[in-house]
């Protein structure tokens, strides 16, 4: 085996996916791996780079398709991808990079605000060596939260926002509201 593999970090909004992605990439940096992170360029909530909801910042390339950054990442051995659910080529890209010996770490929502699979992100599960599903805290009853609930009536899937537009909720609070 060439050492390449895929690590998938999934969960609802506010579960710490981006924070965990940054932690893992930093861990490889400490071990002297050449690392790069990629963020979805339409996510400009906090400015350039990769941002967590608690305003931690990490340098990142920006793209709407991962194939657009292939040339820029050839010299890196660890690739971190934030908001993986928004990249239409996430599955093919991750499989190709892992097969080329690269470590690929993806942070992504597993479900939409309607609790449906988010694009093709779940197709990465059988291709991943490691899958972690994080939970958040329900913003209504403070129990474990596995779901993202959108505030408002907008039905479009790709609406990028933070605490102003979404809540993490448990099953009961999702159903009750």
Swiss-Prot record:
It comes from the Viruses. Gene3D superfamilies: 3.30.60.20, P-loop containing nucleotide triphosphate hydrolases. It catalyses: thymidine + ATP = dTMP + ADP + H(+). It is an enzyme of class 2 (transferase). One of its GO terms (molecular function) is thymidine kinase activity. Substrate binds at residues 113, 157-161. ATP binds at residues 11-18. The active site is at 83 (proton acceptor). GO terms for biological process: DNA biosynthetic process; thymidine metabolic process. The keyword Membrane does not apply. Changing residue 90 to V: In strain: Bangladesh-1975. Keywords: ATP-binding, Disulfide bond, DNA synthesis, Kinase, Metal-binding, Nucleotide-binding, Transferase, Zinc. Homotetramer. Two molecules of substrate bind to each enzyme tetramer. Phosphorylates thymidine and thymidine analogs, such as azidothymidine (AZT). Part of the salvage pathway for pyrimidine deoxyribonucleotide synthesis. Belongs to the thymidine kinase family. This is Thymidine kinase.
């Amino acid at each position: 085996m060439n050492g390449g593999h895929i690590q998938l970090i999934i969960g609802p909004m506010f579960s710490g996916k981006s924070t965990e992605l940054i932690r893992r990439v930093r861990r490889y940096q400490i071990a002297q791996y050449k690392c790069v992170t990629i963020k979805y360029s339409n996510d400009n909530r906090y400015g350039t780079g990769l941002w967590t909801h608690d305003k931690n910042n990490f340098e990142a390339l920006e793209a709407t398709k991962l194939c657009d950054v292939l040339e820029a990442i050839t010299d890196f051995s660890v690739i971190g991808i934030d908001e993986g659910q928004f990249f239409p080529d996430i599955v093919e890209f991750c499989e190709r990079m892992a097969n080329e010996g690269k470590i690929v770490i993806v942070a992504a929502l597993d479900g939409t605000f309607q609790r449906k699979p988010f694009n093709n992100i779940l197709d990465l599960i059988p291709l991943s060596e490691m899958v972690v599903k994080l939970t958040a805290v329900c913003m209504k009853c403070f129990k474990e939260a596995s779901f993202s609930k959108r505030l408002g009536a907008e039905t479009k899937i790709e609406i990028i926002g933070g605490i102003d537009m979404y809540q993490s909720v448990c099953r009961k609070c999702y159903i009750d509201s």
